[in-house]
Amino acid sequence: MTETTGGGGRCFEDFVVGMVIRHPLGRTVTSADNVWTTLIAVNTNPIHFDAHYAAQTEFGKPLVNSPFILALVTGLSVADISRYGVNLGWDEVRMPAPVFEGDTIYAQSEVLSARESKSRAHMGVVEVKSTGFKQDGTVVMTFRRSILVYKRAHLPRPPLPDLR
């Protein structure tokens, strides 16, 4: 079962093992994304910011910093997977193909497991395998992610302001 959503969020009860969610948004990676992420993380590998150096490698141009791609693929899935939850961790992060400036990244996630939380009766633990891919379908990242998700009856509902 595959579905594309508008990002309304899911409560624990909405996750079904085997469900594949195609996240609706894509994002084109810019040079600014790569430079900013590389600088803020103090990543001194010139493959990310030195075009002259990168031109001499097998890639021929700067590679996009992989932690940015991890954040991007995670971010593309938030509205569907963890809007009503918190991350417990990432596992088995893999980067089978490079990402370059100008690539557009899309994502999908498959629900691997869903169980009641042992320590929080008002929540459940969901594990997904997320896949990031380029505009041509090339897979650029995969990872497993565990999320603690609210059950519907316990979902925090902040009051909306009165706009009268």
Mark where each language-model region is.
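Mid-chain, well-packed structural core segment of small domains
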Residues: 83-88, 93, 97-101, 107
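HotDog/MaoC-like acyl-thioester-processing domains
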Residues: 1-17, 100-104, 108-164
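Short histidine-centered beta-strand/loop micro-motifs
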Residues: 61-62, 85, 97-98, 118-121
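Hot-dog-fold acyl-thioester-processing enzymes
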Residues: 2-88, 141, 152-164
